[in-house]
Amino acid sequence: MERKNPSRESPRRLSAKVGKGTEMKKVARQLGMAAAESDKDSGFSDGSSECLSSAEQMESEDMLSALGWSREDRPRQNSKTAKNAFPTLSPMVVMKNVLVKQGSSSSQLQSWTVQPSFEVISAQPQLLFLHPPVPSPVSPCHTGEKKSDSRNYLPILNSYTKIAPHPGKRGLSLGPEEKGTSGVQKKICTERLGPSLSSSEPTKAGAVPSSPSTPAPPSAKLAEDSALQGVPSLVAGGSPQTLQPVSSSHVAKAPSLTFASPASPVCASDSTLHGLESNSPLSPLSANYSSPLWAAEHLCRSPDIFSEQRQSKHRRFQNTLVVLHKSGLLEITLKTKELIRQNQATQVELDQLKEQTQLFIEATKSRAPQAWAKLQASLTPGSSNTGSDLEAFSDHPAI
């Protein structure tokens, strides 16, 4: 058997293997470049895969060192320069070799291929300042004021009309103590009206005998009850010893009251009360009749007999009488009552006259003695009634 010489065949085989390896490397490079070009053309290339080589990184570091920047001081220098140049801006962001593309608004330039949003370029690093939206500073004092306003805000208060009194914040913040003091002040003001009117004129000596031991006469109690009920009592005579209750018929017959009594200090203090009867169209009764003001004043001067509550009632009644007289409502009320009484009396007379007229017509038609007797019987009691009515009307003047 012939043995092959390995020394002769090995260099050829090795050279063939090396040639095949170099060819395969070339083919791989060509395929890689073609794939990269196809990816770039199709638009699906990834920029992150194309990293910088070590040589390019060394070149960028050399350029930064030539500019005076070091690798460790780079963020400090960037922040310092940004703060010095633009104190109001935020720290800058360094983007290496990346160019951000702006999107075109025109629809004609749009294509079917997908375009990348950024492109890797070989140039110096670019600095982009990003401005975050900074909200306006809000002071804490304004927020506190808003909170306090929101607590006191009531939409009902703003709906009041202009003519109505708008309630303020002070009225809402009133405590129970302040409300109590205001009520006490109102009570004091109402109680001061009575003593001021009664003490305006000094009392005459011997006019009203007031002693704690002597009880009040029953006539005074009757006059007081009638005064509290709102019926003006007419006292006959000017002396307080002759107090007499008057019936409601006499009260209704009196068209107005005489305020010229010498024993009434309230009437003496008011000049408008005197001479009222001379100006009124309906002349009242004689001057001997007194007003209910005198009775109220006389009853108010006996504190030992009546309690404080009844005295306050008398004071209020007295003040009411004075106010009604000054405004003229008291005279108007009395005149209205008198007119109502006269109207009722006239209506009764008209009814009687109609009945008598009907009887007279029946008697004339039938000519019967019974009808005439009935007519005569109706006229006999009617004549006495008419006479009494005429006497009642004679006490008062014609209107």
Curated annotation (Swiss-Prot):
The modification Phosphoserine is found at S213. A motif (Nuclear localization signal) lies at residues 186-187. Changing K187A: Loss of predominant localization in the nucleus. No effect on CAD- AND HSPA5-binding. Its main location: nucleus. Residues 1-85, 162-224, 378-399 are annotated as: Disordered. It holds the Pfam family CiPC. InterPro entries: CIPC. Residues 378-388 have a biased composition (Polar residues). GO terms for biological process: negative regulation of circadian rhythm; negative regulation of DNA-templated transcription; rhythmic process. Residues 333-359 form a coiled coil. Changing K186A: Loss of predominant localization in the nucleus. No effect on CAD- AND HSPA5-binding. Keywords: Biological rhythms, Coiled coil, Cytoplasm, Nucleus, Phosphoprotein, Repressor, Transcription, Transcription regulation. GO terms for cellular component: cytosol; nucleolus; nucleoplasm; nucleus. It is found in: Nucleus; Cytoplasm, Cytosol. Residues 1-12 have a biased composition (Basic and acidic residues). Transcriptional repressor which may act as a negative-feedback regulator of CLOCK-BMAL1 transcriptional activity in the circadian-clock mechanism. May stimulate BMAL1-dependent phosphorylation of CLOCK. However, the physiological relevance of these observations is unsure, since experiments in an animal model showed that CIPC is not critially required for basic circadian clock. Interacts with CLOCK. Forms a ternary complex with the CLOCK-BMAL1 heterodimer. Interacts with CAD and HSPA5. This is CLOCK-interacting pacemaker. It comes from Homo sapiens. The lineage of its organism: Eukaryota, Metazoa, Chordata, Craniata, Vertebrata.
